[in-house]
Amino acid sequence: MSTPFVTTLSPSLHGLLKDRLEEKGFIFTQPQHTIFQARSPSVSCTLYNSGKLVVQGKGAQEFIDFFLEPEILLTFTHNRMEKDLRPRLGVDESGKGDFFGPLCIAGVYARDAETLKNLYKTKIQDSKMLNDNQILALAKTIRACSTYDVMILYPEKYNELYAKFHNLNLLLAWAHATIIDQLAPRPSGEVFAISDQFASSESVLLQALRKKSTDISVIQKVRAEQDIVVAAASILAREAFIHTITKLEQRFSVKLPKGASAHVKSAGKTILNTQGKEILSLVCKTHFKTFYEICDSTDI
């Protein structure tokens, strides 16, 4: 992206943007006239005192399409969701950007208009906009009024699968396809599935689905969480992530921060020094750059 992306960010979103960039491992500085400047190897994100936000770098377009627009600029509430009463299936994941903890994929099947009306009555929205207590409360409502399935890939299993696929998008496609196949009615009829487009090409998920027995049609789009069924799936996936990371903390007597920030790296070094590399690999995603940085910088 040769031309910088420029927009004005509402003051209410400044903290959210900074928190999410910290989770992603961006490095922060504060040049003159700025609130902050955050950098990754491929993206520079500068927020000025005026509220002007400037994004540039070779990875800027992907950053904007798959993070900034869907998670920061286009936040929404359930009141703004179009009340589409067509039976459908939504699928979403949680934990793919977190160094510690599992990858969780959830699907929600709203089989009729009554199910959808019940979902619309709740305060369901994209899980990224909710705190943990809200997630846990809404998850109970979703499970009570819909058909659902959740896949939890603990770090040990996740690392095994990543070694098989050698690519996160291929792993995500397999997991999403598996959930869709489990929930899709036979025959699918008018029912369709909606998934966030996590890969640059829609063919990645479609190829994974061809290996399954379902004939359901799938819509992939950026900001799929704006659909209430996908938003419901995102909540169940996040609930599973919260519960599972708590179990891992209790099992290994460690604190596992969310995201991929400097706090995460510090916690990883502590685990490596006190419990060893084997235990560290049981609580984290070992293909992350953070894993190698921790292991290379710590004397065992």
Curated annotation (Swiss-Prot):
**InterPro entries annotated for this entry?**
RNase_HII/HIII (IPR001352), RNase_HII/HIII_dom (IPR024567), RNase_HIII (IPR004641), RNase_HIII_N (IPR024568), RNaseH-like_sf (IPR012337), RNaseH_sf (IPR036397), TBP_dom_sf (IPR012295)
State a single Pfam family of this protein.
DUF3378
SUPFAM superfamilies registered for this protein in UniProt? Ribonuclease H-like
The cofactors named for this UniProt entry are: Mn(2+); Mg(2+)
- Tell me how the cofactor is bound: Manganese or magnesium. Binds 1 divalent metal ion per monomer in the absence of substrate. May bind a second metal ion after substrate binding.
The domain of life for this entry's organism is: Bacteria
Binding-site positions, a divalent metal cation: D92, E93, D196
Q: What is its EC number?
A: 3.1.26.4
The record's PROSITE patterns line, in alphabetical order, gives: RNASE_H_2 (PS51975)
What is one GO cellular-component annotation here? cytoplasm
In its UniProt record, a GO molecular function of this protein is: RNA binding
Q: Does the keyword Magnesium apply?
A: yes
EC top class named in words: hydrolase
Asked whether the keyword Zinc is assigned, the reply is: no
* Localization in the cell: Cytoplasm
The biological processes this protein is annotated with in GO are: DNA replication, removal of RNA primer; mismatch repair
Q: Which reaction does it catalyse?
A: Endonucleolytic cleavage to 5'-phosphomonoester
Among HAMAP family, the record links this protein to: RNase_HIII
Q: From the Swiss-Prot or TrEMBL record, give the protein name.
A: Ribonuclease HIII
Q: Which gene encodes it?
A: rnhC
